Amino acid sequence: MTILSDVKALGQQIWLDNLSRSLVQSGELAQMLKQGVCGVTSNPAIFQKAFAGDALYADEVAALKRQNLSPKQRYETMAVADVRAACDVCLAEHESTGGKTGFVSLEVSPELAKDAQGTVEEARRLHAAIARKNAMIKVPATDAGIDALETLVSDGISVNLTLLFSRAQTLKAYAAYARGIAKRLAAGQSVAHIQVVASFFISRVDSALDATLPDRLKGKTAIALAKAAYQDWEQYFTAPEFAALEAQGANRVQLLWASTGVKNPAYPDTLYVDSLIGVHTVNTVPDATLKAFIDHGTAKATLTESADEARARLAEIAALGIDVETLAARLQEDGLKQFEEAFEKLLAPLV
């Protein structure tokens, strides 16, 4: 048993927040799955880094540039191939759990963040292009993205709803998911294969707030917010309204902790993994955090510990005049901008 297997036994999946051709072709990803990794996430920044630093793309980039394709089409050709290959590596994991684990995420273009219909169309196209049952399409959790989530779920597509910082927005996402499931059931279609994760970002919250907080609260907000979001999750998915859908085969949305590498070197490097282990959750971790957790992390069900203390911390923060929902909206906008910039950098060498 590895520590990752111990975490899985506690009800949480650990995913790798990284993807590149070398990672797949070297067998490194397969080795990580043997250690207990259960899935993979990607984003424009990850692909930008991969394309720039992985020599295995050079020949394909040159060949694609000779074809009459747009830079975005060239990017998608390579990204879809990588996600498909990663899906194949993760397929045995996916099948061993009846389709509950082993997913690989590919994100829609950041420029579609405020365009619900455009998001739906691109998500459908990418899902068809990957053509793997363990592919997950990543959609930003803007109002438009949440509208798209409802449609995509009713289409039977698994979704990673990303860039969540707000508990209120997360609850809106659960309701959209439930509506999508209800539509699909009303049409007499199966829902058992549909998995949705709600990616709630952690370290960026502390990075944004710590400078304004007294020492006793530094590095505490993100974990307190995540614990409160998990309580919201428990209330929503144990309520009779969702139980009726669950009885017809619907899965619960899983909270996925994202941005769990520490940004402040003063904090323990496994802080945002050790502190957020709980049932029906996922933590997607960058390579360095994964290695650190395997080396010296702690597998213990911590997510439901000190819930009263978490609420008290959030109350203290509110008493200081800090509105975490206003902060959440700003952080989501910042995150969208970062992905747009990464996408532009990604496409520039493909012109």
From Swiss-Prot:
- InterPro entries with a match to the protein in the record: Aldolase_TIM, TAL/FSA, Transaldolase_2, Transaldolase_AS
Catalytic residues (positions): K138 (schiff-base intermediate with substrate)
Documented EC number(s):
2.2.1.2
CDD domains (alphabetical): Transaldolase_like
Keyword Cytoplasm included in the entry's annotation: yes
Q: Which NCBIfam families match?
A: PRK03343.1, tal_mycobact
Family in the record: Belongs to the transaldolase family. Type 2 subfamily.
Q: Spell out the protein name for this chain.
A: Transaldolase
- Which source organism does the UniProt entry give? Neisseria gonorrhoeae (strain ATCC 700825 / FA 1090)
Gene name of this polypeptide: tal
